Amino acid sequence: SKWENGTGTPDIANLMAIADLFQISVDELLSNEKSEKKQSDYIYESRTEYDIDGKKNFDIKLGGAYAVDLKAYHGEKIEVAMFSNVYKNLLADYKVKIDDIKNRIDIDLNRFNEASEADAKESLVITIFIPVKYIGKIELSVNAGTLNITDIENEHIEVNGKISEVTLQGNKSEIEIDSNLDMQISVLSHEGALEINQLSATSRLTIPADYRFRSTKKGIATHIYYERQGKKVDDFSDAEADNYIELNGIKSELVIVEAEV
């Protein structure tokens, strides 16, 4: 068509038909908004969207999940997407509730029809997209096998729950993680503070070889160790660095591992 060839404009009826086919709005079809959201490879999915008109703080309570992705994107809406390859009752058993309260947005994931948190931990994948220009402080409560936080630039992110693996990439923030599980934390890139609060846990934090940071431990009987090429080494933190890693809690250990190039 002339539209595809760049020599004309599309008929609105055709646009509406195409948008309906792909289950997106005409505005999204004409913009690049969807290009930042990878299309799902899952069999079952559910999406909830909400328009935002200004900067907001976010209080997100998800309960159990197999994996959670929290990421910023260039758009106008917050979107909560749920996926599963085995949970065919996804649409009926899980509902996202979004409340807009002045300068705060509350996001709650509610379970119905006796859907259990155990089921969610085995099969439920959640991705939350937040518009870059509207991101305030974020509080996230979740029990998940993996958590990925990507491209978020804000003042503070607080994560509470039971989490086994965390990956941080492209963020500029003060990130606080409160989890009493032994965690594997991977920092691919991050600017700012990373504060880890644990009770009787041993976690490993892997950082790039060229990542400069200063570190400190607080609390009671906490220890930070350092590892390079599979061997324990002396403290290689930099007291003059801007990036900051802190371990707090009781009877906990953090091993900071320099990734092999």
Label each residue range with its predicted role.
Residues 60-62, 140, 215-217:
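Active-site alpha-helical segments that house and flank conserved acidic catalytic motifs
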Residues 168-261:
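Short, surface-exposed interaction patches in beta-rich subdomains
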Residues 13-28:
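DNA major-groove recognition helix of helix-turn-helix/homeodomain DNA-binding modules
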Residues 49-53, 57, 89-172, 184, ...:
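Right-handed parallel beta-helix
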Residues 8-15, 88-99, 200-211:
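Generic detector of contiguous secondary-structure segments
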Residues 76, 122-124, 192, 213:
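A generic structural signal for short beta-strands and their flanking turns/coil linkers
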Residues 32-89, 117-122, 225, 229-240:
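Short acidic/polar N-terminal linker immediately downstream of export determinants
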Residues 1-9, 32-34:
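Recognition helix of helix-turn-helix/homeodomain-like DNA-binding domains
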